[in-house]
């Protein structure tokens, strides 16, 4: 559910050994003209009309031969499509084509299907060759707007006279200080983030943090033992656990051995050594004193004489007690665990705590269809989710841009649907999307910010901390899928950490990868076995209904009139169920059927002009909305009959169908609360009607939205910008209080028609889910950057029962939520981020490569110079801030205002415990 409406040498196209390209030609040596081309994309002006902006592409010829006036085609992807592909009925399209014609070039859809974000620029009659040493700037009108560098065209590759294409690298330029580059429209009053703006917003100051708040999510209640400590000795401590907590004991043993020298032997025979960690169950455990047992609750006791006891209401409760214990181990122990100076002990404060979650559903969704993530990357993320007590992990494995799970009996889904490349007719694979297409050799990708590589960094390797030009140059995994065995291992790995895996197969829209794969299958069998060819076919090729999705597709919806559509879906779900059944530890809970982002009816038609719809007596005469009802009723039934509960996006209930269908029991996830779009209250409407709702609101819970408005940030911005504070401040039972400003910075107007939750409706809100869609997840580093520390804010809201009350500001100008943020930001700055810097995957069965640390976003500091004095603060008090007066050659820790009146240049940055730094920023005098 991701709206998207809204540098440099040529390198060789390389073959990828594990796949065959039998009918496609690929270059093995660079073209002598092409290998000297450089490209630069610039934003020029947003103030040229509604929903369009002006950009430019500069082609520089550094070679010895001219780039001729004909015979070449420059291909690229763009999430901001050229306006020239708009129809004649749209004046913007007419004007854009005239603009290009005056420059003697054209831009059109590149692929035969004219579907998606793939385009080609070609010279037309009158084009003047670009001679050696010359540059040519081509002005291009594009749709919507570009606020961030990663909105730029990407994945450029050039073909000469129909020969195999080769990658051409592009650089990107945007000026953060130029409103023409960063102001979406005249209505956009949201400023670009600056050091001065951050300085004003960073109102939290460093404060002491109690044990209750040293953990994320914070503990429900704590009874400290004043001044008492337990010295946990690795050589002495053992783990005492019954057989039914063997999994939890193994996990704890592995986690402690990662941090502290020692064996931490597991003792299940009830022998009591001198120092013990005891795990036990108490099915009657009541953590909040209301007289009833609390699912997933636990009691953690650290006693200087009796050791550590973790008592859980259930196995999950014991496991979450272990996570709390892990987080309470001092940061220095984490730091030294990755060195030759690994600690032999850990000193822990003595106390007793009780804890239990607010919501039963605490989730995260990861889209692996747009950019594939390896099994090992998934393992690491699952372990991190467990660390913060997340218990649901949704994997979007099937979408327009890729099918990522092997389905026995339908090998074409991954033979074709898990590959992207240069295939204009899509005979062997999907065409390239979003600049991620395997086959193009592009060097070594993410490099880290070069300005952070100085002597002062003491050799610490740079890590991704914002836009790098590699993102636009074939970074990303267009190819890849999980085998059945891979997925079984993922299920087991997650189950061992008390996380349920929820697969998402998105239908009837967002199904392009499946559709094209089944057309590939159809063509494979049509001449030899027509029955087999049609067995899983998903479309009516004669359907003349026309639609255009938010992601620019014209062919991504399966047809409900074909019985083969439902044969296909039944096969997919039955094979999926077999995978779950083969892993005894895995819970068979929900399966997500999608149902989102069908283009709005009126300007679009879905199936009304399909001959097969009219020929089928079951579907003949039905409207598109009625056909959707018919489809989703059967789709939900297939999921349910295979033993899964049916999850869907809220679109299924809000606008796709007639509103009169009975889909059976649904568990909807509502994403569309974008301020001003008119759907802000829909989650409450359906919770009040009795649906078990998972809140997934884009404005606060979409991790793939950029942290803030600045061209160097990564992500999207169609619903605004989302940082850790915005996730933390999310109010599940009063979402309207979340809406201070809209995505353009304008105050949100109160709507008296907004529906509020009833008391019964509150009971039907079963949890929260953070979403991470994959368009920009072109490396694991980027994935971690967008997820952390946003995830910590969502974890806090999903677990902690006590929300800050909504009250007026106090004498200091702060509300209860402000004060809660002050505490939480200190928790991150003083405790949580230090541990994320060094955390190791708890790898019980040696499944994950030896790795440690998380590439979380390091916040840029706030800074101003007032009367010659430099003042710096930080979003997370406790993080080190530094300044440089010699253009980054040396960095000085900041302790208080410092005279910089003599300095020609002043730079600031934040630095982590390991020496990683944020992006640097110059502060104007």
Predicted regions and their residues:
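Feature activates predominantly on carbohydrate-active enzymes
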Residues: 291, 295, 303-555, 564, ...
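Short, compositionally stereotyped local motifs that mark structural "simplifiers"
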Residues: 238, 819-925
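Low-complexity, acidic Ser/Thr/Pro/Gly-rich terminal tails and inter-domain linkers that flank the onset
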Residues: 28-51
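Flexible, acidic glycine-rich loops studded with aromatic residues
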Residues: 645-868
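Active-site neighborhood of glycoside hydrolase catalytic domains
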Residues: 549-665, 673, 677-678
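Terminal connector regions
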Residues: 52, 108-118, 127-190
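Acidic, contiguous N-terminal accessory segments
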Residues: 152, 158-335, 339-357, 647-654, ...
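Asparagine-centered strand-capping/turn motif at beta-strand->loop junctions
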Residues: 58-66
């Amino acid at each position: 559910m991701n709206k998207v409406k809204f540098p440099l040498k040529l390198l060789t196209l390389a073959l990828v050994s594990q796949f065959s390209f039998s009918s496609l030609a690929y270059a093995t040596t660079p073209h002598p003209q092409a290998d000297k081309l450089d490209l630069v994309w610039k934003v020029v002006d947003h103030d040229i009309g509604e929903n369009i902006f002006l950009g430019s592409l500069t082609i520089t010829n550094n070679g010895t031969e001219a780039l001729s006036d004909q015979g070449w085609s420059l291909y690229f992807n763009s999430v901001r499509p050229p306006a020239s592909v708009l129809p004649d009925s749209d004046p913007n399209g007419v004007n854009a084509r005239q603009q290009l014609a005056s420059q003697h070039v054209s831009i059109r859809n590149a692929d035969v299907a004219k579907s998606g974000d793939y385009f080609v620029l070609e010279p037309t009659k009158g084009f003047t060759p670009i001679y050696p040493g010359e540059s040519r700037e081509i002005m291009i009108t594009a749709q919507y707007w570009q606020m961030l560098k990663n909105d730029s065209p990407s994945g450029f590759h050039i073909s000469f006279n129909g020969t195999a294409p080769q990658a051409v690298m592009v650089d990107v330029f945007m000026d953060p200080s130029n409103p023409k580059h960063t102001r979406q429209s005249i209505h956009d009053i949201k400023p670009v983030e600056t050091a001065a703006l951050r300085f004003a917003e960073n109102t939290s100051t460093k404060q002491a943090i109690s044990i209750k708040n040293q953990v994320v999510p914070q503990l429900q209640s704590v009874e400290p033992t004043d001044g008492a400590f337990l010295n946990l000795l690795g050589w002495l401590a053992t783990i005492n656990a019954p057989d039914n907590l063997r999994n939890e004991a193994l996990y704890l043993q592995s986690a402690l051995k990662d941090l502290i020298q020692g064996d931490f032997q597991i003792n299940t025979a009830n022998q009591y050594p001198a120092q013990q960690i005891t795990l036990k169950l108490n099915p009657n455990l009541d953590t909040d004193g209301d007289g009833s047992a609390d699912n997933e609750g636990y009691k953690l006791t650290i006693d200087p004489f009796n050791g550590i006891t973790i008592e859980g209401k259930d196995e999950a409760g014991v496991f979450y007690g272990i996570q709390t214990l892990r987080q309470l181990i001092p940061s220095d122990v984490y730091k030294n665990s990755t060195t030759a100076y690994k600690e032999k002990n850990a000193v822990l404060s003595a106390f007793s705590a009780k804890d239990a979650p607010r919501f039963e559903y605490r989730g995260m969704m990861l889209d692996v269809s747009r950019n594939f993530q390896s099994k090992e990357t998934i393992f690491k993320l699952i372990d991190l989710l467990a660390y913060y007590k997340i218990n649901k992990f949704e994997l979007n494995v099937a979408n327009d841009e890729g099918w990522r799970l092997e389905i026995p009996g339908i090998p074409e889904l991954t033979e074709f649907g898990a590959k992207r490349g240069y295939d204009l007719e899509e005979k062997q694979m999907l065409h390239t999307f979003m600049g991620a297409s395997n086959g193009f050799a592009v060097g070594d990708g993410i490099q880290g910010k070069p300005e952070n590589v100085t002597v002062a960094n003491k050799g610490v390797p740079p890590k991704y901390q914002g836009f790098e030009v590699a993102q636009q140059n074939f970074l990303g995994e267009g190819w890849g899928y999980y085998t059945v065995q891979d997925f079984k291992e993922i299920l087991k790995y997650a189950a061992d950490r008390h996380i349920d895996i929820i697969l998402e197969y998105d239908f009837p829209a967002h199904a392009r990868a499946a559709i094209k794969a089944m057309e590939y299958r159809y063509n494979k069998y049509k001449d030899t076995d027509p029955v087999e060819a049609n067995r899983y076919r998903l479309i009516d090729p004669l359907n003349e209904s026309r639609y255009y999705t938010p992601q620019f597709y014209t062919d991504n919806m399966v047809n409900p009139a074909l019985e083969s559509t439902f044969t296909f879906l039944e096969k997919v779900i039955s094979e999926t169920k077999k995978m779950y059944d083969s892993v005894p530890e895995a819970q068979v809970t929900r399966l997500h059927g999608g149902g989102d982002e069908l283009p709005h009816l009126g300007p679009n038609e879905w199936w009304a002009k399909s001959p097969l719809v009219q020929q089928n007596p079951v579907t003949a005469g039905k409207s598109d909305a009625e056909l959707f009802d018919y489809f989703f009723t059967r789709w939900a039934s297939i999921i349910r009959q295979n033993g899964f509960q049916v999850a869907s996006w809220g679109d299924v209930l809000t606008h796709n169908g007639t509103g009169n269908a009975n889909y059976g029991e649904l568990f909807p996830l509502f994403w569309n609360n974008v301020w001003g779009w008119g759907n802000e209250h829909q989650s409450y409407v359906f919770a009040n009607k009795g649906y078990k709702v998972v809140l997934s609101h884009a404005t606060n819970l979409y991790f793939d939205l950029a942290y803030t408005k600045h061209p160097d940030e990564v992500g999207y911005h169609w619903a605004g910008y989302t940082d850790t504070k915005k996730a933390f401040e999310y109010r599940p039972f009063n979402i309207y209080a979340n809406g201070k400003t809209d995505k353009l910075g304008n105050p949100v107007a109160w709507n008296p028609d907004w529906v509020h939750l009833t008391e019964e409706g509150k009971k039907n809100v079963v949890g929260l889910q953070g979403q991470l869609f994959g368009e920009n997840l072109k490396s694991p580093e980027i994935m971690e950057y967008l997820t952390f520390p946003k995830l910590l804010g969502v974890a806090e809201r999903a677990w902690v029962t006590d929300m800050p009350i909504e009250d007026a500001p106090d004498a200091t100008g702060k509300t209860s939520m402000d004060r809660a943020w002050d505490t939480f930001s200190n928790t991150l700055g003083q405790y949580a981020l230090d541990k994320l810097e060094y955390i190791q995957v708890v790898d019980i069965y040696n499944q994950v490569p030896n790795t440690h640390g998380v590439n979380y976003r390091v916040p840029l500091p706030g800074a101003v110079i007032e009367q010659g004095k430099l003042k710096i603060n930080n979003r997370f008090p406790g993080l080190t801030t530094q300044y440089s007066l010699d253009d980054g050659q040396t960095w000085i820790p900041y302790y208080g205002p410092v005279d910089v009146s003599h300095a020609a240049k002043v730079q600031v940055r934040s630095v982590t415990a390991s020496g990683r730094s944020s992006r640097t920023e110059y502060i104007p005098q």
